[in-house]
Amino acid sequence: LRLRRKSTTLIFEERAFPLLRIWHHWEKGGGLAAQTTDGAIRGEGMVKKATETKTTSSPAVGTAAEASPALDKIWLKSYPKSVPHEIDLSKATSIGDMISNACRQFTDRPAFTCMGKDLSYKDLDENSRGLAAWLQSRGLVKGDRVAVMMPNILQYPITISAILRAGLVVVNVNPLYTPRELQHQLNDSGAKALVVLENFAATVQKSLASIHVPNIIVATMGDMHGFKGHIINLVVRKVKKLVPAWNIPGHVRFKDALAQGRGKSFNPVPVGNSDLAFLQYTGGTTGISKGAMLSHTNILANVEQMQLWMDVAFQNKGKPKELNFVCALPLYHIFALTVNAMIGMKLGARNILIPNPRDIPAFVKELQKYPFHIFPGLNTLFNALMNNDEFKALNFKPLILTLGGGMAVQRPVAERWQQMTGCHITEGYGLSETSPVASANALDATEFSGTIGLPMPSTDIVIRDDDGKDQPLGEVGEICVRGPQVMLGYWNRPDETSRAIMPDGFFRTGDMGFMDENGFTKIVDRKKDMILVSGFNVYPNEIEEVAAEHPGIVESAAVGIPNEHSGEVVKLYVVRRDPNLTEEDVKSFCAQRLTNYKRPREVEFRDALPKTNVGKILRRELRD
């Protein structure tokens, strides 16, 4: 079986799929067209760059039912009654227009709050227009890429709003990148400008010899805080010493760029819904990161899908006039980017920005200041918060929605959260390549399901084997997604695009799972994280969920290690809550709940587990 599995994989990788995306091109006279990896739309004698194409309505990217047999969409029978099966993007234009509309409609409302300072929609409008004008004055034109390297501070939404309104493309950069990682992303994207917080400017300085970015704008933590900003900068630089010495010749200060831009005229740029909006880099935890090309349609579709989904909760629990989102996940990550920033602006909500969510006491102090209604997060964050005594004392009555994503939500964590807050965690699923939300549990549910829910409106999910054949209900295979939120492809990587997106438009997620008879999908694990014990598939998530039930364990991570008899065995890394917990205690606990081949053969205790900046556990580092 293992040999057959390897051979079919090799055969599949040798196939060439020149047709990467299929959709109906809705322009007058348009027909069946194909999106190729160079960004051109080709079909029926027309050749246009995606960045030059205007459509009167959204191309149904990835929804090409005509390219494959009709699906039995069994999930529709489980849909909330008020949620339509399909979304209407006929009036969608661009993200910049969405932001402009929000600024007009919600002028005096706070859009973002950080460290006690409100940024109203009027402020967002004026500042982003000024920065957009400045970028245009530096010679940046439609389609140019601008990198953004900042945590959750007020300058972030100003910057991405300016970029998008100027018809440019946002390249989100993890501020904790090393010089090597930063060089790769800037060079790969061909960024013409970089906006960076001074805390990370030293990394940029170390990269200068290997990059060519003509415009570098440097922000400070206190830029948007008036006189208080001087005190903030003093504390950050001198007291906490969070700003290493740096020197970037020719850089421009963020405040100076804003001031200069206000004196210039901003020229609105016509942007089509199929134009690029984001290069969202992904895959950095598994190899060289690559840019997922997300169009304005991709993001707007996901905003529309999630808004329809969230309306169910508002219908059941009410919707306050001024809605507050907790924004603890980094905005450069696709989850917070769409669910917090984009949906928040569409709804006229306030996002409470948390620059450093790992500082749990400071995080909780911010939560004490405001009623919070929408709380996106991930398993490790929820777990860490519930171990804080002051968090337990917060007023949770206003909480309408808790949205879990980014990694599997463990049932013990979900049950404890519901008991503590009175609000269950609604788990969803997605990736950078799907903008990100592909599926979610219904928001009128009253308890945690342990699944990733139902496909979003206008979205199809199938389970396929290594040969690309659909699996029957209940059978494990790779989760594949098709819908208007699925990316155009990987930037300058046609081979990887053709491997990831099948001819019928389905995107291979790399996650293993199955669909039940009601259309709910359950993830069993990442394909690459699967452990093979004597020919049996073992999924780390299952072992970690069992370990999470032990009162003496804070968190754990399961990996496979070589074994001469069984090929691999399970090793469990554990962070203890109970200092007296022993290896035998853990093994005995697991033995009562797991069949023999799934049980950990080794247990190693750690003070902490390696994680990404978003909080995902890095199993790869533990394996290495």
Task: Set out the residue ranges of the language-model regions.
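Conserved AMP-binding/adenylate-forming core of the ANL superfamily
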Residues: 87-91, 100, 108-153, 157-161, ...
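Gly/Ser/Thr-rich phosphate-binding loop
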Residues: 349, 369-376, 386-447, 460
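Conserved pre-ATP/AMP-binding loop-to-beta segment of ANL
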Residues: 107, 245-281, 288, 313-324
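Conserved AMP-binding/adenylation subdomain of ANL enzymes
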Residues: 300-324, 332-373, 388
